[in-house]
Swiss-Prot record:
EC number: 3.6.-.-
Organism of origin: Nitrosomonas europaea (strain ATCC 19718 / CIP 103999 / KCTC 2705 / NBRC 14298)
Residues annotated to bind Mg(2+): 229, 250
Domain TrmE-type G per the UniProt entry, residue ranges: 215-372
Entry function: Exhibits a very high intrinsic GTPase hydrolysis rate. Involved in the addition of a carboxymethylaminomethyl (cmnm) group at the wobble position (U34) of certain tRNAs, forming tRNA-cmnm(5)s(2)U34.
Assembly description: Homodimer. Heterotetramer of two MnmE and two MnmG subunits.
One GO MF term attached to the UniProt entry: GTP binding
Cofactor(s) it depends on: K(+)
Protein name as it appears in the record: tRNA modification GTPase MnmE
Gene label: mnmE
HAMAP family: GTPase_MnmE
Amino acid sequence: MTSNDTIAAIATPPGRGGIGIVRISGTNLESLARGILGKLPDPRHAGLFSFLDQNSQIIDQGIALYFPSPHSYTGEEVLELQGHGGPAVMNLLLDRCLQLGARLAEPGEFTLRAFLNDKLDLAQAEGVADLIAASTANAARCAVRSLHGEFSSTIHQLVSALIDLRVLVEATLDFPEEEIDFLQSAHAAEQLATIRAKLEQVLVASRQGNLLQEGIKVVLAGQPNVGKSSLLNRLAGDEVAIVTDIPGTTRDTVRQSIEIEGIPLHLIDTAGLRETSDIVEQHGIARTYAAIEQADLVLLLVDSRHGVTEEDRSVLTRLPERLPVLTVHNKIDLSAQPPRLEENTSGPTIYLSAINGEGIELLRAALLKTAGWQANIAGEGAYMARQRHLQALIQAKELLERAAAWLHRADQLEILAEELRLAQQALSSITGEFTSDDLLGEIFSSFCIGK
């Protein structure tokens, strides 16, 4: 995974802009700097330079910044060339760096080198990418907390507490005749209970952060002409779907992303579900069920004038059992019913009008609740957790549940010790202490080139 060669890349987005940056990282950048700038800039001082080609002709004029090792982003020597942000200028400058011995950086390679040089751990490195990719203000704030090490610090505290408990258990194994009394006197059960409670708090906060990052996929399903497209337009605040009185107008899925309290909701309007001989409409219905398979939540729309019909119940039987369903009785403006939310054994039911907006706020609140959103946690305490973080936390939780069961079994302390070891390993994988090269490659390959 390690490499001592010099890498270079354009660090700013493609296209035209006021400023463009070429970033270089490696060892012994003096010769490269002399080839472009005429000299190595003073460390950590911005200087105005002419950027030169191989014939000493000026490519551009701009700012150069030099960061000596180890006090740089990557932990290596880093040189940043800040010029005018035209693509031709940036490419000429990058080509000059490659002529002088640098190679083009792979996606995420600067941050990978920062990780390998202990400038940040794996969760912080992922925080860099999450901050760049954040689509909402709340997601950006959570990503900054991860980048600054708040998530990692919490994980390290859990790992440290587990190590202390493991030391106690391993020591007990050396004195089998006193093992249970020894563990009881050291309050091992209380220590384990404290670790499990803290882990549960971290898992809840991480789920909130994952929700901020990923959002939820919501499919609008139902029979033709119940107002699915009208509801999509109402939630989106724009005319993103065609609305007519003709059943079967929507033949394909229409996708639109919105935010509710900073949570991305990926809405998918679908073809009306009914028996039809129309080949095109049949394809649309097939795509509807394909979208439902990938959804996190289904809004089943029905006409409030008719209520839930046998056809609607037939649709419900075809939905995956794991999938939460919100039943929406639309068109209350025509049925003269008040907007309301009813909690039923089958799930929440909302009465609303997509045309005049009555009951829409009830739907928004129900969407957040069903998604698991907890504003009191997510405001300042959520961690920008990825799916792999959640999997590691859940694995550690299950291992510690089993460990608690083994704790009072004098003849099974070896199993207890192993469960604790595996739980520690699962948590340590979050920060990269136990991580395969394949996983590192997968994580950093999703980064931008130049980062």
